[in-house]
């Protein structure tokens, strides 16, 4: 029995110590630092708004795309159901998926004859991208204006208000947050 304890005691103590350090202490420290340094992002970047009854309602996250399909809304990138897309860009399956999405856009807005921006017919790498390009937002302005009975100028102003610039002024492209635009559109008095 003594030999058994000599062998297993260090293993059990090591297991418990590593579990405590790696499972409690380290995540706790990282959570505290993240909460202090990035207060809004550490808790999911949840968007909250005051409701008519005075309570606060949660509408979603600034960092996770939501599906909008009604014509009066700005519609984001094609969702891939929360999973990354692994399709080869030149595969037949990808081609059929893009053609299906193009047909959906033409059915949604048959009067729009412009070329559909690529990000509206392809899914992002994460499958839950909350932003679209300025071109993708501009493609939808006339439809949103018509469906909501508001001027295109108003729609463009709302889109511009929720467009983020390039990172550090030169990295990447400006993007438009779909959820923020739709919340702003819904807040308009009609």
UniProtKB/Swiss-Prot annotation:
Gene Ontology MF: a single term: P-type potassium transmembrane transporter activity
Compartments where found: Cell membrane
Membrane topology: Single-pass membrane protein
Coiled coil start-end: none
Pfam families, sorted: KdpC (PF02669)
Transmembrane domains' residue ranges: 13-33
Keywords (A to Z) from UniProt: ATP-binding, Cell membrane, Ion transport, Membrane, Nucleotide-binding, Potassium, Potassium transport, Transmembrane, Transmembrane helix, Transport
Gene Ontology cellular component annotations, sorted alphabetically: plasma membrane
Major subcellular location class: membrane
NCBIfam families tied to this protein: kdpC (TIGR00681)
Record's function text: Part of the high-affinity ATP-driven potassium transport (or Kdp) system, which catalyzes the hydrolysis of ATP coupled with the electrogenic transport of potassium into the cytoplasm. This subunit acts as a catalytic chaperone that increases the ATP-binding affinity of the ATP-hydrolyzing subunit KdpB by the formation of a transient KdpB/KdpC/ATP ternary complex.
Assembly and interaction partners: The system is composed of three essential subunits: KdpA, KdpB and KdpC.
Protein name: Potassium-transporting ATPase KdpC subunit
Species in which this protein is naturally found: Listeria welshimeri serovar 6b (strain ATCC 35897 / DSM 20650 / CCUG 15529 / CIP 8149 / NCTC 11857 / SLCC 5334 / V8)
């Amino acid at each position: 029995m003594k030999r058994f304890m000599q062998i297993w005691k260090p293993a059990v103590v090591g297991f418990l110590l590593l579990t405590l350090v790696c499972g409690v202490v380290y995540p706790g420290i990282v959570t505290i630092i993240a909460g202090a340094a990035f207060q809004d992002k550490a808790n999911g970047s949840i968007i909250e708004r005051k409701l008519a009854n005075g309570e606060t309602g949660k509408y979603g996250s600034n960092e996770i795309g939501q599906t909008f399909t009604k014509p009066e809304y700005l519609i984001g990138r094609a969702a891939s159901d929360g999973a990354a897309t692994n399709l080869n860009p030149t595969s037949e399956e990808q081609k059929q998926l893009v053609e299906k999405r193009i047909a959906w856009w033409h059915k949604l807005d048959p009067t729009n004859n412009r070329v559909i921006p690529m990000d509206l017919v392809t899914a992002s790498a994460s499958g839950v991208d909350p932003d679209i390009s300025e071109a993708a937002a501009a493609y939808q302005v006339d439809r949103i204006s018509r469906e909501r009975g508001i001027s295109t100028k108003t729609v463009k102003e709302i889109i511009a208000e929720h467009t983020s610039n390039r990172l550090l002024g030169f990295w990447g492209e400006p993007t438009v947050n779909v959820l923020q635009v739709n919340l702003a559109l819904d807040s308009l008095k009609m």
